[in-house]
């Protein structure tokens, strides 16, 4: 079965939307997490969050913390929500953290390799995706998991995300 599912729920670029849209998206996020956290737990799904959580409103962070706590011991599907995330942000953040370790003398430049970079990515500890499904008729990856998608199969569909069903997954 599927062990990991990553959803690109809110990109760093979404912060540039009009304020009323951002507020609406944050309310949708909080309501969805509040409504679904217990269902995730009952279905043995473990929730993870990647991205710049400091950018989220406090009420959203608090709701996410509760859901993470509720599902922390679950051993089934790993559901990874990318919130306030972009691939460029992730790579820049990883490079900055590696540079900081070099500056502190904890890491030698000569020892930096692909494994080092992967350790500093938000997805450290998760396998690279095997399949990326892009819905809504878009034909781009939109700054999502730029490093991790290197060898993934890419599937594009006109089906909108809210309408995406099990049959669509099998088709992919």
Predicted feature descriptions by range:
Residues 1-172:
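Flexible, compositionally biased loop and terminal segments
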């Amino acid at each position: 079965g599927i062990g990991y599912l990553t959803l690109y729920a809110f990109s760093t670029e979404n912060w540039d939307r009009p304020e009323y849209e951002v507020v609406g998206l944050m309310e949708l996020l909080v309501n969805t997490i509040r409504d679904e956290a217990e269902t995730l737990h009952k279905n043995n799904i473990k929730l993870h969050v990647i991205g710049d959580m400091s950018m989220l409103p406090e009420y959203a962070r608090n709701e996410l913390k509760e859901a993470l706590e509720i599902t922390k011991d679950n051993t089934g599907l790993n559901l990874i929500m990318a919130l306030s995330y972009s691939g460029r942000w992730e790579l820049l953040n990883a490079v900055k953290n590696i540079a900081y370790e070099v500056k502190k003398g904890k890491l030698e430049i000569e020892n930096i390799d692909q494994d080092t970079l992967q350790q500093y990515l938000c997805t450290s500890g998760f396998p690279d995706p095997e399949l990326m499904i892009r819905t809504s008729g878009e034909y781009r990856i939109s700054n999502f998991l730029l490093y991790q998608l290197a060898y993934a199969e890419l599937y594009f569909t006109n089906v909108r995300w809210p309408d995406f069903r099990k049959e669509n997954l099998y088709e992919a």
